Amino acid sequence: MRKIIHIDMDCYFAAVEMRDFPEYRGKPLAVGGSSDRRGVISTCSYEARKFGVRSAMATAYAFKLCPDLILVPGRMQVYKDVSLQIREIFSRYTQLIEPLSLDEAYLDVSECQQYKGSATLIAQAIRRDILAETGLTASAGIAPVKFLAKVASDLNKPNGQYVITPETLPEFVKTLSLRKIPGVGKVTAEKLSSLGLNTCGDVQAYSKPELLARFGKFGGVLIERSQGIDERGISADRERKSVGVETTLAKDIYSLEQCQQVMPGLIQELALRLSRSAKERKIHKQVVKLKFNDFKQTTIEHRSDEVSIVMFYDLLAQAMARQEGRGIRLLGISVGLADSILAVPEIPNAQTQLDLAL
């Protein structure tokens, strides 16, 4: 059995800000774009989350939920520098590290001999080192497989850890919600629920041929995950294929003009996320996605080697041509990343381009 640790920093961007600016501690704090420019929240403190503030939420809506919210702009270079410190701590215990973002990663410690090979003690040591050297807390999940390690890291947040052993795994997955399985979103969960399938235990008892007939290849994945099977290894050289941002709207909107009003905040957040890239990558396409109130979605893409805000607005107009009177529930934009290592993709002269687009 493998020993997989999933490390997830606690409200990372906000935690760095509270570390560097003690006056923010204990207060509802968010890192994100200005509400005046229809920005979105990147992350927020636990104090803000008590009011319902969440990542990817429109900043203006966040202020409605929490009028005393403290909003600060992101300092991406600082977050990158701290992330490198954390990565160095990981490397003391294993070289099998799969970064998922600046603030989370998978580690395979199956061959680590420190602490007599105890993944539980190794995770404790890593979290202790992170706190001592960066002043930040991290949560951890330990399991024999990747997706369960990620599930476990969320169970004792903040500043805690949870262990799923080979012995406890069968009982743990029986009651695990299918929404915790990667690939099971809202629409798929509703389809599964209509069949009486809400937990992994439900899937275990269901007809496997029928699942495969209804869901095809994903049905096979669902059967495996529901038994706690995940053969995916740690991809130490894993590279992201795209960077994007999307927002679920508080209420459905119907016009192109309303969608255009949402775009500036998404563009600001996309610029932040592009600057997080660990490696310098060139883009090869831009994409706009719309999800309608009947849960169907459409995407429009354009091949490009540089980010153009005007092009995002053109793609939005093309996507809206497929609306057919339906309400828009979600709007997203993204860029595809090329394999070549070139310049960090940026969004040049953003406000000028916005003025032109609008």
Swiss-Prot record:
Active site positions: E104
Major place of residence: cytoplasm
Cofactor(s) this protein requires: Mg(2+)
Signal sequence annotation: none
InterPro entries hit by this protein: DNA/RNA_pol_sf, DNA_pol_Y-fam_lit_finger_sf, DNA_pol_Y-fam_little_finger, DNA_polymerase-Y, DNApol_IV, IMS_HHH_1, Rev_trsase/Diguanyl_cyclase, UmuC
Alphabetical keyword list: Cytoplasm, DNA damage, DNA repair, DNA replication, DNA-binding, DNA-directed DNA polymerase, Magnesium, Metal-binding, Mutator protein, Nucleotidyltransferase, Transferase
Cofactor note (record): Binds 2 magnesium ions per subunit.
A Gene Ontology term for the protein's cellular component: cytosol
Domain UmuC stretches: 4-185
Catalytic activity of the protein: DNA(n) + a 2'-deoxyribonucleoside 5'-triphosphate = DNA(n+1) + diphosphate
Molecular function (Gene Ontology), one example: DNA-directed DNA polymerase activity
Location of the protein in the cell: Cytoplasm
Class of this enzyme: transferase
Site features described as Substrate discrimination, chain residue numbers: F13
Enzyme Commission (EC) number: 2.7.7.7
Record text on subunit structure and interactions: Monomer.
Function: Poorly processive, error-prone DNA polymerase involved in untargeted mutagenesis. Copies undamaged DNA at stalled replication forks, which arise in vivo from mismatched or misaligned primer ends. These misaligned primers can be extended by PolIV. Exhibits no 3'-5' exonuclease (proofreading) activity. May be involved in translesional synthesis, in conjunction with the beta clamp from PolIII.
PANTHER family in the cross-refs: DNA POLYMERASE KAPPA (PTHR11076:SF33), DNA REPAIR POLYMERASE UMUC / TRANSFERASE FAMILY MEMBER (PTHR11076)
Family: Belongs to the DNA polymerase type-Y family.
Name of protein: DNA polymerase IV
Species: Shewanella baltica (strain OS185)
Chain's gene name: dinB
